[in-house]
UniProtKB/Swiss-Prot annotation:
Superkingdom of the source species: Bacteria
GO molecular function: structural constituent of ribosome
The protein's name in its UniProt record: Large ribosomal subunit protein bL34
Biased composition (Basic residues): 10-19, 31-44
UniProt organism field: Acidiphilium cryptum (strain JF-5)
Listed GO CC annotations: ribonucleoprotein complex; ribosome
Single GO biological process annotation from the record: translation
Gene: rpmH
Lineage: Bacteria, Pseudomonadati, Pseudomonadota, Alphaproteobacteria, Acetobacterales
Keywords (A to Z) from UniProt: Ribonucleoprotein, Ribosomal protein
Any Pfam family the entry gives: Ribosomal_L34
Family of this protein: Belongs to the bacterial ribosomal protein bL34 family.
Keyword set includes Amino-acid biosynthesis: no
Positions of the UniProt region annotated as Disordered: 1-44
Amino acid sequence: MKRTYQPSKLVRKRRHGFRSRMETVGGRKVLASRRAKGRKRLSA
């Protein structure tokens, strides 16, 4: 059986990176809530 997590830096950046978050309204909300919470890292 193949494991579900197959790490890839490129895919990680494209799916969960800052720029991809900024592209959508939902992503912006994610960043806003993480800023409000005071997260050191906002995105991957």
